[in-house]
């Protein structure tokens, strides 16, 4: 594998800093997508979705800090160890955002639940399954204390779900 140092050091380059990467084999039952919600302001991907068609067992290890993000608080309320999807956003940690951050995350969860349920209903197998908001996990990383851009994220959910695929390479 080669790394193009000119691209690696140039923040304006939108292509991968790693250059060519080995082909990743599909993981059975997992679909992945990534899109830009323009959280960085430069068009690069900043949202990722991992969708487990049959569901997946999970365990979480979270911070012991008393300061937690809305995403961590959401995940801690999931009382079972089974999920259907994990959505990750960058650029905003959704921490110190108060009730607005929590409400924004709930709106995202409702929109994601609806889109994944619709995707499930269009399955070639003809099996329709409701994806509940309690089937969803969230992770946010980035700046602390800024308003959570939930509308930018929510508006990209249909495209994020549409782009789900088993091949992880773009």
Tell where the protein language model's regions lie, with residue ranges.
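Alpha/propeptide regions of enzymes that mature by internal proteolysis
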Residues: 2-119, 130-170
